[in-house]
């Protein structure tokens, strides 16, 4: 049995992470899922939230804003709309985004705008939670 697996997180703009890890936990649409070495292959849609991984006895957190995770051949590949390591998150920017989204939610009448504001609020809150784990 393998002792580690490879985790790769990619966005349309860049490669965010490429490391050997011991465990991956991710926010799936149906709930959080975990992947250990030698896991069976599967594909899952990702929700907005905190992906975390364990490597060398430490837990690391990465904000992901949707996308997909593929598990195959002892590798987890995450294709995310956006992703940021916890230590790279600008907490002031996240707080300002949260405040803007809450203001829009208080004013919005149309459902389309409401959904966009709600998604922006979810992203801001998730970034703040992930940054709190750094």
From Swiss-Prot:
Membrane topology: Peripheral membrane protein
Coiled coil: none
A single MF term (Gene Ontology): proton-transporting ATP synthase activity, rotational mechanism
InterPro entries: ATP_F1_dsu/esu_C_sf, ATP_synth_F1_dsu/esu, ATP_synth_F1_dsu/esu_N, ATP_synth_F1_esu_C, ATPsynth_dsu/esu_N
Keyword line: ATP synthesis, Cell inner membrane, Cell membrane, CF(1), Hydrogen ion transport, Ion transport, Membrane, Transport
GO CC, one annotated term: proton-transporting ATP synthase complex
Broad class of where this protein is predominantly found: membrane
Keyword Cell membrane in record: yes
Keyword ATP-binding included in the entry's annotation: no
S-S bridge residues: none
Localization of this protein: Cell inner membrane
Summary of the function given for this chain in its UniProt record: Produces ATP from ADP in the presence of a proton gradient across the membrane.
Subunit structure comment from the entry: F-type ATPases have 2 components, CF(1) - the catalytic core - and CF(0) - the membrane proton channel. CF(1) has five subunits: alpha(3), beta(3), gamma(1), delta(1), epsilon(1). CF(0) has three main subunits: a, b and c.
Family: Belongs to the ATPase epsilon chain family.
Protein name: ATP synthase epsilon chain
Species whose genome carries this gene: Nitratidesulfovibrio vulgaris (strain ATCC 29579 / DSM 644 / CCUG 34227 / NCIMB 8303 / VKM B-1760 / Hildenborough) (Desulfovibrio vulgaris)
Source taxonomy: Bacteria, Pseudomonadati, Thermodesulfobacteriota, Desulfovibrionia, Desulfovibrionales
């Amino acid at each position: 049995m393998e002792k580690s697996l490879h985790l790769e997180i990619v966005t349309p703009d860049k490669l965010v992470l490429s490391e050997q890890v011991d465990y991956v936990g991710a926010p799936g649409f149906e709930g959080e899922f975990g992947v250990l070495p030698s896991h069976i292959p599967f594909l899952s849609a990702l929700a907005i939230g905190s992906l975390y991984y364990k490597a060398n006895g430490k837990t690391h957190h990465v904000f992901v804003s949707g996308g997909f995770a593929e598990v195959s051949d002892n590798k987890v590949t995450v294709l995310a709309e956006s992703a940021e390591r916890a230590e790279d998150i600008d907490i002031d920017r996240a707080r300002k985004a949260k405040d803007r989204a809450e203001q829009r939610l208080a004013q919005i009448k149309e459902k389309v705008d409401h959904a966009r504001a709600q998604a922006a609020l979810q992203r801001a809150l998730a970034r703040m939670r992930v940054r709190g784990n750094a």
